[in-house]
UniProtKB/Swiss-Prot annotation:
It comes from Human immunodeficiency virus type 1 group M subtype D (isolate NDK). A motif (Nuclear localization signal) lies at residues 26-32. The viral protease is inhibited by many synthetic protease inhibitors (PIs), such as amprenavir, atazanavir, indinavir, loprinavir, nelfinavir, ritonavir and saquinavir. RT can be inhibited either by nucleoside RT inhibitors (NRTIs) or by non nucleoside RT inhibitors (NNRTIs). NRTIs act as chain terminators, whereas NNRTIs inhibit DNA polymerization by binding a small hydrophobic pocket near the RT active site and inducing an allosteric change in this region. A motif (Tryptophan repeat motif) lies at residues 982-998. The keyword Metal-binding applies. The record marks 129-130, 360-361, 374-375, 430-431, 438-439, 485-486, 584-585, 1024-1025, 1144-1145 as: Cleavage. PROSITE patterns: ASP_PROT_RETROV, ASP_PROTEASE, INTEGRASE, INTEGRASE_DBD, RNASE_H_1, RT_POL, ZF_CCHC, ZF_INTEGRASE. The record marks G218, P219 as: Cis/trans isomerization of proline peptide bond. This is Gag-Pol polyprotein. Residues 1367-1414 bind DNA.
Amino acid sequence: MGARASVLSGGKLDTWERIRLRPGGKKKYALKHLIWASRELERFTLNPGLLETSEGCKQIIGQLQPSIQTGSEEIRSLYNTVATLYCVHERIEVKDTKEAVEKMEEEQNKSKKKTQQAAADSSQVSQNYPIVQNLQGQMVHQAISPRTLNAWVKVIEEKAFSPEVIPMFSALSEGATPQDLNTMLNTVGGHQAAMQMLKETINDEAAEWDRLHPVHAGPVAPGQMREPRGSDIAGTTSTLQEQIAWMTSNPPIPVGEIYKRWIILGLNKIVRMYSPVSILDIRQGPKEPFRDYVDRFYKTLRAEQASQDVKNWMTETLLVQNANPDCKTILKALGPQATLEEMMTACQGVGGPGHKARVLAEAMSQVTGSATAVMMQRGNFKGPRKSIKCFNCGKEGHTAKNCRAPRKKGCWKCGREGHQMKDCTERQANFLREDLAFPQGKAGEFSSEQTRANSPTSRELRVWGGDNPLSETGAERQGTVSFSFPQITLWQRPLVTIKIGGQLKEALLDTGADDTVLEEINLPGKWKPKMIGGIGGFIKVRQYDQILIEICGYKAMGTVLVGPTPVNIIGRNLLTQIGCTLNFPISPIETVPVKLKPGMDGPKVKQWPLTEEKIKALTEICTEMEKEGKISRIGPENPYNTPIFAIKKKDSTKWRKLVDFRELNKRTQDFWEVQLGIPHPAGLKKKKSVTVLDVGDAYFSVPLDEDFRKYTAFTIPSINNETPGIRYQYNVLPQGWKGSPAIFQSSMTKILEPFRKQNPEIVIYQYMDDLYVGSDLEIGQHRTKIEELREHLLRWGFTTPDKKHQKEPPFLWMGYELHPDKWTVQPINLPEKESWTVNDIQKLVGKLNWASQIYAGIKVKQLCKLLRGTKALTEVVPLTEEAELELAENREILKEPVHGVYYDPSKDLIAELQKQGDGQWTYQIYQEPFKNLKTGKYARTRGAHTNDVKQLTEAVQKIATESIVIWGKTPKFKLPIQKETWETWWIEYWQATWIPEWEFVNTPPLVKLWYQLEKEPIIGAETFYVDGAANRETKLGKAGYVTDRGRQKVVPFTDTTNQKTELQAINLALQDSGLEVNIVTDSQYALGIIQAQPDKSESELVSQIIEQLIKKEKVYLAWVPAHKGIGGNEQVDKLVSQGIRKVLFLDGIDKAQEEHEKYHNNWRAMASDFNLPPVVAKEIVASCDKCQLKGEAMHGQVDCSPGIWQLDCTHLEGKVILVAVHVASGYIEAEVIPAETGQETAYFLLKLAGRWPVKVVHTDNGSNFTSATVKAACWWAGIKQEFGIPYNPQSQGVVESMNKELKKIIGQVRDQAEHLKTAVQMAVFIHNFKRKGGIGGYSAGERIIDIIATDIQTRELQKQIIKIQNFRVYYRDSRDPIWKGPAKLLWKGEGAVVIQDNSDIKVVPRRKVKIIRDYGKQMAGDDCVASRQDED
């Protein structure tokens, strides 16, 4: 004892006894802690004497540290004590244990760094296999040691892709090159599924690298290294020397570290799959055998301790959902009732070898056969427990029974005195409204006119008879239902009398309980012991099977548990037998069936993170909505989700829930909007009595189609993902969903229809939830009718809150203010601002447009001009002088309040229109002068060039349409245009349209036509033939004219177009002609503009032409077709085309060369894109030094030569499909083969070679492809065989993607064929001949034929070209008289030849070349392939 106590001496012991055990705690270290530590060390066979020195403490800590993570509490306490003791020895000042442990760790980290530094100084060679410097100073590679590889293999074998694998891989691959990393991956290549996932990640990252690091154009400078591509980093297209050079260059490119990072990304994905955090993460790997997947699935399930029911449900849903596509198809075909053994048998051989089959099948049969040990009384997926609320004082946390507050008088439910709550007869199935009454009958009875689809959302228990075996959800109970069944409201506990074993008992109907549990009762028959979990913990019960029980007069037989339960419970096992349902009274309206768009599934959008206060607000809102039956909780079986968020209400601290239904709206069927616009007060007839009502919670009163509810699912997340989110779905029409307005409007119309029929004297205007009710009844009678209407709506579940019930004028309705004999818009205030943003101006224009309905003369054209172009909402826009003036005028107009009157059907409508200038018009519609029904404005220009008459007709049509909508008839028009002007326009203008009856009103400014075009040529006037031409590339152009009197003129223009030059030519003719002129053009565009006689235009050029036309006395404009040999037209065409229009033979060569230098596209793409002959396109490729890599395809690119095919085996429905893809065209040949053997593969290959020219086959390293039989078949058929490179991004890419495509098509046609082999051939036919796209927009079948035919033609042409190449060409440039050459002849056309001089490819006209034979130096004769043309 003394020895142990002497660990610390005097001063140190005082320090020890001042240190607290916990931060802020009262207890401090004492001598007893040292004695305890000594004894513990002895127990762990450590020397207690080590405690006496700081060095000894350090040694103890070194021993204890590795055990802390997995050790017991005692070890942790011992570690803490020793750490504190170390600090005392070292005289480090600490206040408590926590601080001591932190100080200790700091010391350790410092010493560790020192050790590492010392190790680095003493040796320049890493422990693994980095790049090292040899004696000559060269950087050489020290190969990876077998010991390291062995360690890596053991890690994978022992840890099987658990999270520890990643740090171990990182440590073992320190300083590795890509080649080393690939060696490590190849040693564990047997894990096919994992390697496939890793390969996909590497491919993705390599592609991303290439995207972010594009290749620099041009050749690499001498002595400079090329930049690594994605496949170089992955070690597939780079040599070890290149990798070392990159890693050691200055600055270095750490290709090893980059590749290692990619592999770790892939390993992370694999770890997530093999060591999932939750059951939802357990997914089957791409090539993982189904049995291995099941094994992992159940291992995790067993760890989660779920009840057997939950496990069964997971097997049926999650196991199928998360299987790979091959297995999923099979599992779905088996149907929902398949056992686990059936599933595993069916999936045998799919995705890989079934090496665990027998063992696993036996294990699984034991798992599923054994009875579950723990049966939870309630489901595992319940939400948090609801807090108790006191009926008496209203506070949470206690019941009324235990309430200390003075007892409240009267009933706690209805508030009336004279009875207690348990005797209350008041019906309050009130889940949606403040006050829901059913005045026409007893609780739960609806009048006979109300038919209803019995939704399982009425919150009452309804028991259906045994003679009527219906489903639990009540899906079959459509239409009218008799309400004679017992209904039990949930305002009290649903207690009923039951009869069991000849005894009467009182029991609680509990839809939340799985089992029926009764307190001590003697029942006949055998029983077995069982444990069940309830709210208060576990209880022991006796289980009796096949017991008859009578509930509410209906008999059921099932399992009954007997034990010490606080209350008798009838659970779901018996309630479902008697057809008991839980119902909510939302609205007794029939639901409107809704579907998704064909071929679409529901939304699966992830919920984004939300702040804590938003989550709390949403939880409160949703709890309230759930109580009211608007939404219901759902389990994880619903795969759909829509994101939600919360915003604060305007001028309030309350939150509002918003659901982002954009994705669901895209997928939901389209609806026909019942109402096409909003009602207008000018169309209201004058009524004696008026009332305005508002329907409260409008959408939430209408039920949503049951089958559609699942698609409205949303999730409230938890803070820091503490628990799974709470999932809900809507039972009613959601706000923000596209179907809600249409369904609500049609439901409201149906409900109001009987009331409208019974009360024809009452006018009801309905727009969404706003109701305008008018009548000519006395106010007392009118209000009685209003109450009847409110009652009628209430019967259907719609409340009309008093708060929004307007009885006295002025009535605020739809943004209008209604008085008994007049109406106006609600007051409008235009803001005064120093600076205006785009958003401010948008709001301002909106207000002015709204005001223009009754305030005449409002203009917004100049304000709208400020908003042109794409501007940010917050961008400040300076007001132009015109806009400021317009705004000031509008302010003046709005100063005086203006009112409109109501419509009198006995009087005519009159519309008067005035021109305001600047293309703006104002109008008034009235029945009596100076008493406007409404006003408005028109300022739309339907084209760049217009005139007043055209605008006037457009305005009239707008007013006529508006009148038909509001009053059902067109008004008489008073227009500021003379009849003669109108007649002239209407007869001449081919686009003129009908306008209604009208009369002339002399309101200046009058509308007139400013000039007229003649119908016949003007005799004696000069005729101008005009034309214009422009070059699209250079944007240079010419315009001009030729006259019948020999005059001509051509003017050049820059930055122009063909259309502009045509108009420029007309402008020239008008400027240079007299007062009378004939103009002939070949431009339909120019003719169309001028024939419409515009008097204003947005185009400056057209405005100049209008000015010239107004000055003329007579103008005749005619059109002739271009290039048809018409005298003057042909002359002027030649004039303006010179040097502008250039028709060059093969003028795409330069562009093709430029594009090839940038993108190095293949000859076929150039031939297609630039319309070049294949030989010229191939020559461009041949003259490119980067594209000449020994005739092979460039690294990392798929070789698309015509004879190359890729082959691969894929699996579907337990069978093997051998797929061959013609790489260049995407054409497929596929067959179901009996077995994946070399014999079958060789036979398929010979069949393929017999149909198509096969030069090369590219396959993976599968045993069937590497077999001797296939090699023999390839040798016989003269086919070269190539194999894929491991981890090469493009190695088997074409056939892999075709496998997916083929399976997708098979899935689409599978139900049309009995056998898989038939479906495969159908899919091949569809792919080859019914799907078009890619180069040329062909189908794959057309493309392969085209490619093979082109190849044959090219070979033939090549033979001719070899002959042509025996000729040499001497040529002259346009301005240089000296003959150049000899050049090589590439192509001979009709008017030009294509030659190659050094590396330049040129197009030279035939008249400027001399073609001679190489040997003879004489001119080529007529018999030669390239006969000579006449020279200039």
